[in-house]
Amino acid sequence: MEYRFLKSEVRENGIVVLTLANPASLNALNSATLQEINHFVMNLPESASLLIITGEGKAFVAGADISEMADFNAQQGLDFGRFGSEVFRRIEDLNIPVIAAINGFALGGGCELAMACDIRIASAKARFGQPEVKLGIIPGFSGTYRLSKLVGQGYAKEMMYSGRMIDAAEALRVGLVNHVVEPEELMPYVNSLAEDIVANAPVAVRYAKECINRNYDMSETDGIELESQLFSKCFDTEDQKHGMKAFMEKTKPEFKNR
């Protein structure tokens, strides 16, 4: 598939960079862009070890495309919301880590896209918000669910009821992002973090992600049992044998993803 609104890079170590590249619209999410993201995520190379998502220009994603939504009826709104949520859930469920490198505005669907990623690193110039109520709607791509999980119901309600934007420092304070860096340091910081992650045992990283993600919907007892089961499965991997041997021999491990 030839992409109109996306650019991508695949590095030798398996790190994949996906850039939303429609800066004239501030990378707004329309149906075509969502289709492209969906196709890209479903067709990641088998060698992919980590995905970085960022935006071109002054926005990460400044929201959904209002010009497309303006004449929706209820059924069209349902279809659009469900598809966006499906795409973002597919990103969340990838068996590799996903980092959002938030270079600018992350509003509405852009904030929702960032929240579907495992880790969020923000430029000091980034701005966040769920301003949908100013347009007569509510978040439609699972924002009410994920924002409440990340920052708590009280703060999520304040953001959604008021429609106000918050800056990167406030996003860091409330737990919406992991780190804030100067704009020129955003990609170097994200690249360094990505390289640290992919240097670790891929199966172990995958199991850690599975535990954390699935714990959302589990009781404490079931979540702890899942951890025990996946912890035990690590001992059937070559990477565990090699990693512990390298530790005891004070050498650097080279993991094989098996």
Positions of predicted regions on the chain:
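Conserved CoA-thioester-binding segment of acyl-CoA-metabolizing enzymes
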Residues: 1-56, 89, 187
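Terminal low-complexity tails and localization/encapsulation signals of metabolic enzymes
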Residues: 1-4, 245-258
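Glycine- (often His-adjacent) and acidic-residue-rich active-site loop
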Residues: 38, 46-47, 55-90, 106, ...
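C-terminal long alpha-helix characteristic of the crotonase
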Residues: 23, 121-126, 177-225, 229-233, ...
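Well-ordered beta-strand positions
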Residues: 119, 158, 162-164, 170, ...
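CoA-thioester-processing core
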Residues: 87, 91-95, 101, 107-161, ...
